[in-house]
């Protein structure tokens, strides 16, 4: 597909996926500062919630510094042109959370499921459409499903009322060819008016290349984060993606230099650690492991003396998926016991 002159919607993840490396402890001032910068740079859609979506505050996923209501209530009134989205994972977020988000002024709701479990999204997608919200079906860990399986799941979400379907590389595992294969298949199967999106992670440093491949395959919504702030090695770094789009003639409406300044001056200073491809985040991509598992594995490493890399490789071997964070500690305990037993023998 020729991309010269193609218009796409860039969707910011800094204030949602970026909550993972911040351990969900972003302050209201940090959130407002970054959101206003993104708005001024021309980013049209910004996601704001706990890293695991509406209702994510829990022992399993982590307690945030503020509630979803407080974050959304602080950011939405400040926006001059950008719309705000929220993520919702059925089983974590509820229809009540959906109504709360709508009442606060959230424009877009993204209902996320594992790539083979779209059927659990029906209630939430149907409710969002009844509220006349921009409603997105978000298929996570898409590398684990064949194009044919993704088509089946995407069409379920479309049938429930989703006006946009996302193919999501939650593990940062896919290469550009994998992205094209899946998105071209899904694009061909959906109704022409149904939009197509791609969400990438940078664990194999493929975030930008994969996002370009997605646009070439027919996607018109692309997720990215300023300075890549997100789980694992981060999301597709927005400032790089915007520059590449500008070079290629893809129209984003985002100012090339203003988004660089947001990344450099507003996002990098709040990082608890530099978001980069290190051995553990690289392992996420190599082994096909859910990106938000990274900090859980690092904590287990300190607690049980088993390397985070070994834990992540084992999680990949077991094909664990998002929502099974509790299994990280269980896996680390098992591995530590096995090694202690071998040492004793």
UniProtKB/Swiss-Prot annotation:
InterPro entries: 2-IPM_HCS-like (IPR050073), 4OH_2_O-val_aldolase (IPR017629), Aldolase_TIM (IPR013785), DmpG_comm (IPR012425), DRE_TIM_HOA (IPR035685), PYR_CT (IPR000891)
Active site (catalytic residues): 20 (proton acceptor)
Binding site for Mn(2+): 17, 199, 201
Record flagged with keyword Metal-binding: yes
Keywords: Aromatic hydrocarbons catabolism, Lyase, Manganese, Metal-binding
CDD domains: DRE_TIM_HOA (cd07943)
GO biological process: one example: catabolic process
UniProt GO MF annotations: 2-isopropylmalate synthase activity; 4-hydroxy-2-oxovalerate aldolase activity; manganese ion binding
Coiled-coil segments on the chain, per record: none
Lineage: superkingdom: Bacteria
Pfam families associated with the record: DmpG_comm, HMGL-like
Site (Transition state stabilizer): 16
Residues of the Pyruvate carboxyltransferase domain: 8-260
UniProt-listed NCBIfam families: 4OH_2_O_val_ald, PRK08195.1
Family, as annotated: Belongs to the 4-hydroxy-2-oxovalerate aldolase family.
Protein name: 4-hydroxy-2-oxovalerate aldolase
């Amino acid at each position: 597909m020729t991309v010269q002159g193609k218009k796409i919607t860039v969707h910011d993840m800094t204030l949602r996926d970026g909550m993972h490396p911040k351990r969900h402890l972003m302050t209201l001032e940090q959130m407002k500062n970054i959101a206003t910068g993104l708005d001024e740079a021309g980013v049209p859609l910004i996601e704001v919630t706990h890293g695991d979506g509406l209702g994510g505050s829990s022992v399993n996923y982590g307690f945030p510094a503020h509630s979803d209501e407080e974050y959304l209530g602080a950011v939405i009134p400040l926006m001059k042109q950008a719309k705000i989205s929220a993520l919702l994972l059925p089983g974590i977020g509820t229809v009540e959370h959906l109504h709360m988000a709508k009442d606060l002024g959230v424009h877009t709701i993204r209902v996320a499921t594992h790539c083979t479990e779209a059927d659990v999204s029906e209630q939430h997608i149907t409710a969002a459409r009844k509220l006349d919200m921009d409603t997105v079906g978000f298929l996570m860990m898409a590398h684990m499903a064949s194009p044919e399986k993704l088509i089946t799941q995407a069409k379920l979400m479309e049938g429930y009322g989703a006006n946009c379907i996302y193919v999501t590389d939650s593990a940062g595992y896919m290469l550009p060819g994998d992205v094209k294969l899946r998105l071209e298949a899904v694009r061909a199967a959906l109704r022409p008016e149904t939009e197509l999106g791609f969400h990438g992670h940078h664990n194999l440093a493929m975030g930008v290349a994969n996002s370009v491949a997605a646009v070439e395959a027919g996607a018109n919504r692309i997720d990215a984060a300023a300075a890549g702030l997100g789980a694992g090695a981060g999301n597709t770094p927005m400032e790089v993606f915007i520059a590449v789009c500008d070079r290629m003639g893809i129209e984003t409406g985002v100012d090339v230099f203003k988004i660089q300044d947001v990344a450099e001056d507003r996002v990098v200073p709040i990082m608890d650690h530099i978001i980069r491809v290190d051995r553990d985040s690289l392992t996420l991509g190599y082994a096909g492991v859910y990106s938000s598992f990274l900090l859980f594995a690092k904590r287990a490493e300190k607690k049980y003396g088993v390397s985070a890399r070994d834990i992540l490789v084992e999680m990949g071997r077991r094909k664990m998926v998002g929502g099974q964070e509790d299994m990280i500690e269980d896996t680390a305990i098992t591995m530590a016991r096995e090694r202690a037993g071998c040492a004793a023998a």
